Amino acid sequence: MSEPRFVHLRVHSDYSMIDGLAKTAPLVKKAAALGMPALAITDFTNLCGLVKFYGAGHGAGIKPIVGADFNVQCDLLGDELTHLTVLAANNTGYQNLTLLISKAYQRGYGAAGPIIDRDWLIELNEGLILLSGGRMGDVGRSLLRGNSALVDECVAFYEEHFPDRYFLELIRTGRPDEESYLHAAVELAEARGLPVVATNDVRFIDSSDFDAHEIRVAIHDGFTLDDPKRPRNYSPQQYMRSEEEMCELFADIPEALANTVEIAKRCNVTVRLGEYFLPQFPTGDMSTEDYLVKRAKEGLEERLAFLFPDEEERLKRRPEYDERLETELQVINQMGFPGYFLIVMEFIQWSKDNGVPVGPGRGSGAGSLVAYALKITDLDPLEFDLLFERFLNPERVSMPDFDVDFCMEKRDQVIEHVADMYGRDAVSQIITFGTMAAKAVIRDVGRVLGHPYGFVDRISKLIPPDPGMTLAKAFEAEPQLPEIYEADEEVKALIDMARKLEGVTRNAGKHAGGVVIAPTKITDFAPLYCDEEGKHPVTQFDKSDVEYAGLVKFDFLGLRTLTIINWALEMINKRRAKNGEPPLDIAAIPLDDKKSFDMLQRSETTAVFQLESRGMKDLIKRLQPDCFEDMIALVALFRPGPLQSGMVDNFIDRKHGREEISYPDVQWQHESLKPVLEPTYGIILYQEQVMQIAQVLSGYTLGGADMLRRAMGKKKPEEMAKQRSVFAEGAEKNGINAELAMKIFDLVEKFAGYGFNKSHSAAYALVSYQTLWLKAHYPAEFMAAVMTADMDNTEKVVGLVDECWRMGLKILPPDINSGLYHFHVNDDGEIVYGIGAIKGVGEGPIEAIIEARNKGGYFRELFDLCARTDTKKLNRRVLEKLIMSGAFDRLGPHRAALMNSLGDALKAADQHAKAEAIGQADMFGVLAEEPEQIEQSYASCQPWPEQVVLDGERETLGLYLTGHPINQYLKEIERYVGGVRLKDMHPTERGKVITAAGLVVAARVMVTKRGNRIGICTLDDRSGRLEVMLFTDALDKYQQLLEKDRILIVSGQVSFDDFSGGLKMTAREVMDIDEAREKYARGLAISLTDRQIDDQLLNRLRQSLEPHRSGTIPVHLYYQRADARARLRFGATWRVSPSDRLLNDLRGLIGSEQVELEFD
């Protein structure tokens, strides 16, 4: 093989994020195809792709050279930034490169990105080779300016600190000043004896990728492609040229080519991958192994005392627990993981001791008795048949992985504790990368290409919003996409470009829960990435790479439900303390509570963790779970596999005796499998059951059975053939019929694909049960906590308030004196609306109000509040929202007066603040002392009509709280529905039609699998709710009426809704209130007294009626005197349409009691 003549030493992948188009693997593949012996990837101030690059390089027979490009500043050039490429020659250089990168991020950075000081290179110079940065380096810029003194100073610095390790970089990519710089650099090299090196400053693989790269950069920089201000820093020649092309390009400077090979030979970094390094856990004089044994045995004693309070039963059950504990401890210590368990034990115990709610466990870790004994998990694995080998398999060495759920509010406290315990430089969170996803890349590319918003939006909306959606999947899922792609050249060009950019790394963020703890500094294993302020460090390797690099990942996950449970318990225990009751321990509640299961069987699971979706409620209704094992099964059953395979139907039918229970099949079953499959009525539902079947029938160890389970999941033919043979051989040894064994193997293989991790299912079922129990026993506190968690989502709060009303809970409006930021429960068991849930207010103003209230007591009235609160934080707009929401109802006569007095109150508060500033407290009499003075201080005005009050609540709270728009129609609606309210509805007999009325609170149109359209709306008359279905004919006729907040009168047949357990109506006729009046009203009655009538009133009456003439309803004027009453009927030309506007105008003119519709 001939000696290589060139190696690429400056290449950006997409991990540079500011530029670079290709992923590391394709870059390596291209280099291999070009016959290159080595390749350097030098992303901008990061090694994010290093682990993937290192693995791909060695896999392709290419030496990976570790390096990075930097922005550099030095005093000689002032604020001007220059470029420098740094390569690691050896492991010391790799360490110094890691420190340089980390330091650049930790100092903070601006729009130009992280920057290093050139002086940092003095201390960290060992093992590093520098490429000068070409025309953009400090020497390059000085040469182009002809500043020989500056050139000399720069060169002297590198000669002193990097002798034989500093190369003048030569680039020929057709960009401005490259040739001028190159000639000057060659002259300098000859004059000073400096080596030169050729690079192609690669940004993409092929020259055809240039346009895509330009768009990628424009997306990052926020320009359109045609913008004359857009920087044009790249050329089509920055692709991965072949050795031949580079040799031809630099034929006049052969030493620049030869030096690339020499540098590649000098760069020999070994990155240790695939080993694990844990921090040392403090164990005193004991070994880590012995300390784990000690703590586990002590913990088991406590657990057994709780599980079996009766000593005799405890003695009877102890042997199986002791044996299991011994087995697990042996495996953990043999595999070298005692420290891992102790570390997790410590931060979980610290959390519990410091009021941070922790989940009962999740994932396969719940199968470990050692974890249960150490209080890492809270489920007894023996009681629920959870297997340790599903978590840690001695026959397949891999790190244990506890996913630990913490309360969202306090999770960061735990991470802070870990940082304090092991050292801040030894603890870090993990990076995650955002990529250009299908929907977003269409929008980004469309914007950069200058297409109108509507054009791009139309294409983007055709891409389904499903997680993991790609353009390829979208073309399969949405028929319109290929159609417009073929029909429109502009669409085709946009999508073709989007395909080139899809999946390209766009930005970096923080992994949701991953934390690594190093035995030394994090930077001994991975460089750090920080935010712009130099805070919140994360490793530059993602979660899989950072583990491969030797750091052990701990998952600190935030679970919102734990926060809800915590908030609920705080309110509950506050109440219990007042009543002299001990605090409630949620971990100690019974798992067989009848009240909870009764509520579950009624599908009343709104706000219950994991059980609140429509589909889940349907499953609950069918299954009728009556024990905790059924709840574990619910979590496992509600997945696409079991739902689509018919497994769910079999499970339900077997539970309710409609199908014979067999183990596992009527034709092919074995009695020895009954203990394994009995909890799931003979259905193979869990992965653990797959393992137990292999153990029972064929004598597998549980470790071997876990390998079988994995093989069945991967479905590799050669592996399955091997396992089939092992299974048959084991069954034969156990005396089991060969045909039966193989038939059961086939059944197990079929269901293994649907099997769910029971440990995870059981752990999450426990959290579900805890929320169910709280809802059943402490409904107000639980719902207040749930609404607090959803305060930022008004739509969800509205739905939860509906649920509260359905449950019979009372919700009070927000109150500025008794209210809190969160929803809470008062001493009367009523939920007080959270002030923080008022739209348009924000946390700052509320904090200012509560601070003033805590300092000076309750506010007496509006003027007092404005005077005592910082009006810089509490501006007029915020105060208006608070008034409209009802939060100030106790501060004044009514909302209209409060609103009209707001200007005076703010003015008085301003005067009060000025007076206080010069020591003249209350000089202007702002703070009235007497109630009479307070009343007089408010503007005199009429209260708002109820509808205005309700509209204000709707605007600020998202719902009507103190009233209902239907209230003003109730008397009238009784005429249309025969006095029947929605709460009194019942199923109608076949063929019989009933009429109902209510406010539309939800409306939608859906398309069935057969393509039929169905309209669904929910009516509310404040007594109850009714779901109304409009099938095709009715929908075609009445769809325009299906609008939220409209009053509808609907006639149809009522039946039970199997899904909700409530009632539903199939509509035949739908009317709005105006149409109902036209149909049913016989006249509009206006009653006047002799004292009211004068020419002015009659004139205004005519003006009110005039716009509504040409209707169908006659107008009747009733004239009332002390001694007589007369009726005057207006002529036919004065028939009117009795709209809300007309009725409200007349009632405002004459009086609400004097205007009525007349009916037969």
Curated annotation (Swiss-Prot):
Gene3D superfamilies: 1.10.150.870, Bacterial DNA polymerase III alpha subunit, thumb domain, Metal-dependent hydrolases, Nucleic acid-binding proteins. It is an enzyme of class 2 (transferase). Its main location: cytoplasm. It comes from the Bacteria. GO terms for molecular function: DNA binding; DNA-directed DNA polymerase activity. Pfam families: DNA_pol3_alpha, DNA_pol3_finger, DNA_pol_IIIA_C, HHH_6, PHP, tRNA_anti-codon. Its EC number is 2.7.7.7. CDD domains: DnaE_OBF (cd04485), PHP_PolIIIA_DnaE1 (cd07433). It catalyses: DNA(n) + a 2'-deoxyribonucleoside 5'-triphosphate = DNA(n+1) + diphosphate. GO terms for biological process: DNA-templated DNA replication; lagging strand elongation; leading strand elongation. Keywords: Cytoplasm, DNA replication, DNA-binding, DNA-directed DNA polymerase, Nucleotidyltransferase, Transferase. GO terms for cellular component: cytoplasm; cytosol; DNA polymerase III complex; DNA polymerase III, core complex; replisome. It is found in: Cytoplasm. DNA polymerase III is a complex, multichain enzyme responsible for most of the replicative synthesis in bacteria. This DNA polymerase also exhibits 3' to 5' exonuclease activity. The alpha chain is the DNA polymerase catalytic subunit. It is tethered to replicating DNA by the beta sliding clamp (dnaN), which confers extremely high processivity to the catalytic subunit, copying a 5.4 kb genome in 11 seconds, a speed of at least 500 nucleotides/second at 30 degrees Celsius. Belongs to the DNA polymerase type-C family. DnaE subfamily. The DNA polymerase III holoenzyme complex contains at least 10 different subunits organized into 3 functionally essential subassemblies: the Pol III core, the beta sliding clamp processivity factor and the clamp-loading complex. The Pol III core (subunits alpha, epsilon and theta) contains the polymerase and the 3'-5' exonuclease proofreading activities. The polymerase is tethered to the template via the dimeric beta sliding clamp processivity factor. NCBIfam families: polc, PRK05673.1. This is DNA polymerase III subunit alpha. It comes from Escherichia coli (strain K12).
